[in-house]
A protein has these predicted regions:
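NAD(P)-dependent short-chain dehydrogenase/reductase
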Residues: 139-142, 146-176
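SDR active-site strand-loop-helix element
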Residues: 7, 51-55, 91-97, 143-145
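Conserved Rossmann-fold NAD(P)-dependent oxidoreductase catalytic core, especially the SDR/UDP-sugar
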Residues: 78-118, 133, 141
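NAD(P)H-binding glycine-rich loop region in Rossmannoid oxidoreductase-like domains
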Residues: 40-85, 99-102
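Active-site segment of SDR-like NAD(P)-dependent oxidoreductases
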Residues: 58, 97-100, 104, 113, ...
């Protein structure tokens, strides 16, 4: 049985992942942890095979830029370092497509990151800090999802969905 620890216990992705595992009876033991409480540092990570790091500050207009770096970069690297030090073999970092900036065209493996927001910049810096920890005993996977949506999702999707139903205008997109 794989043992997984999810950071960001209240995240939409984390809750949805847990529901999926439970619904399909997949043989994983999943725990969650809230990194807002400094007691997380006392948690024994050695019992886990994988950490899925979802904890983040996303697009909050009222936040100072420094909080993005404190949470999205510094905390992420600290969690990854603790995981490595305690023998976790897999670390999955959820980053963001925002690392590419807002005005990019088609994104492929040659696309260079060029973040424009504190959110995107802090996530890219987290990627760079965490990838340095990778070795033969500690595998790092970095995912850069676009907008996350689904039933009961938070964020902009519901607003965009409602707007698209009111305005009958769709841009022509050459989707490759």
């Amino acid at each position: 049985m794989k043992r997984i620890l999810i950071t960001g216990k209240n995240s939409y992705i984390g809750r949805t992942f847990i529901d999926w595992v439970e619904e399909d009876n997949i043989d994983y033991e999943i725990d969650t942890i809230d990194l807002k409480n400094p007691d997380w540092k006392k948690q024994d990570f050695s019992r886990y095979d994988c950490i899925i790091h979802l904890a983040a500050i996303v697009h909050k207009k009222d936040q100072e830029d420094a909080i993005y770096y404190k949470v999205n970069r510094d905390l992420a690297v600290e969690v990854a370092q603790k995981a490595k030090n305690e023998g976790v073999t897999q670390f999955i970092l959820f980053s963001t497509m925002s690392v590419y900036g807002m005005n990019q065209g088609i994104i492929n493996k040659e696309t260079k990151p060029l973040p424009k927001t504190p959110y995107g910049k802090s996530k890219l810096e987290a990627e760079k800090g965490i990838i340095k920890l990778q070795d033969e005993n500690f595998c790092v996977s970095i995912l850069r999802p676009p907008m996350i949506y689904g039933p009961n999702a938070t964020g902009n999707y519901n607003r965009l969905s409602k707007l698209s139903k009111k305005i009958n205008v769709f841009t022509k997109i050459n989707n490759q």
